[in-house]
Regions:
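Secreted/periplasmic proteins
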Residues: 1-105
Length: 105
C-alpha cells in the first residue's frame, strides 16, 4: 500500500491518506460543483481536480463504499478527500482520520 500525497491521485492499487474528512452541516441544500444538491444522504466525495463522476472506493475497518466525485474540495491544506455525510455514515468514518482508497470500483 502506498501513502498518498495531496494532489492528483494515481490509478492502481490501494493508497492510504493520513487525514480524510467529511462535510455537510451548513451546506445542505446547496448545489455541488457537479450539479447535485447536497443532502444528508447524498453518496459522494469532494476532490479538487478529479472529473465529476469519477468513482473512488474507500475502505475502513472492514467496510467499503464506492462513490462518485460530486463536488470540489477539501479546502484544508494536506487533505485530498471530503466525504459527504451519506458516504461517511455508510463507511463508519464520520471524523477526521486515516483511510484507504483506490480509484474505480
Amino acid at each position: 500500500m502506498r501513502k498518498a500525497t495531496a494532489g492528483s491521485p494515481v490509478v492502481g492499487g490501494w493508497h492510504q491518506d493520513r487525514e480524510i474528512s467529511w462535510y455537510g452541516p451548513g451546506f445542505y441544500g446547496n448545489g455541488t460543483a457537479c450539479g447535485q444538491t447536497l443532502t444528508k444522504t447524498l453518496m459522494g466525495v469532494a476532490h479538487r481536480s478529479l472529473p465529476c463522476g469519477t468513482l473512488v472506493t474507500f475502505r475502513y475497518k472492514g467496510r467499503s463504499v464506492t462513490v462518485p466525485v460530486v463536488d470540489r474540495g477539501p479546502y484544508v491544506a494536506g487533505r485530498t478527500w471530503d466525504l459527504t455525510k451519506g458516504a461517511c455514515t455508510a463507511l463508519g468514518h464520520c471524523f477526521t482520520g486515516p483511510i484507504e482508497w483506490h480509484l474505480g470500483s
